[in-house]
Amino acid sequence: QGAAAVIAEGGESGGHVGDLTTLALVPQVADVVSIPVIAAGGIADGRQMLAALALGACGVQIGTTLLRAAECPIHENYKAAILKAKDGDTTVTGRAAGAPVRLLKNPMAREYLRREKAGASLEELEHFTLGSLRRAVFDGDTRNGSLMAGQVAGMVHEILPVADILECLYSECRALAGVISGHPALETREGA
C-alpha cells in the first residue's frame, strides 16, 4: 500500500529535529512526492498555517501550541515554562550524538551542552538524560527535565481548550487567505 501522507517537519519544531527549516523543507518534499504533505515545525497560528499551505502542504501538524491546551496531560510546571518562554528560549542538544533535540533552555539543557562540547561519550550523555522527559512531563521538574518545545514557544501565552486553539488557527488562516489575495505585492504592474 505505502504511506497515505508524509509529515515534513522542520528544525523549528520541538523534540527530535533536523537541519532544514519548514520553509525550505515543505516545498522540496511536496515537489517530489505524489501523496499529501503535512507541514510541521514552527506553526502556532493562522499566519504560519497559511504559509504552510502556500508551500504545498495539505495541512499542518502542531505540537508546541498544544502543550498549553487545558486537556494536555503534561505537568502544570511544564505548561508554565512554555507560557513564560520567549523567542530565543529554545536550544538544540544532541547534535554531536546525531540525535538533535530542541527543548527549552534550563539547567539540564545547559549542562548537556557543556558536556557535549567537552566531548562526553554517547553513553555518558544518555545516562545524564535518562528519565529527563519523565521528570518534565510527570514530575514537573523544570530544572532537570527535558522540556521539549519548538521555537514558537514564545508565541504561546495562555492555556486554552484544544477546540479554541484549533478554531483560532483555522479562522485566522481563513481570514488571512482573503486578505493576502489583495496584497499590493501581488498586484500586476503595468510594464513589469
Annotate the PLM regions.
Residues 1-36:
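Active-site entrance/lid segments in N-terminal catalytic domains of soluble metabolic enzymes
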Residues 22-38, 44-192:
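Conserved active-site-proximal phosphate/metal-binding subdomains
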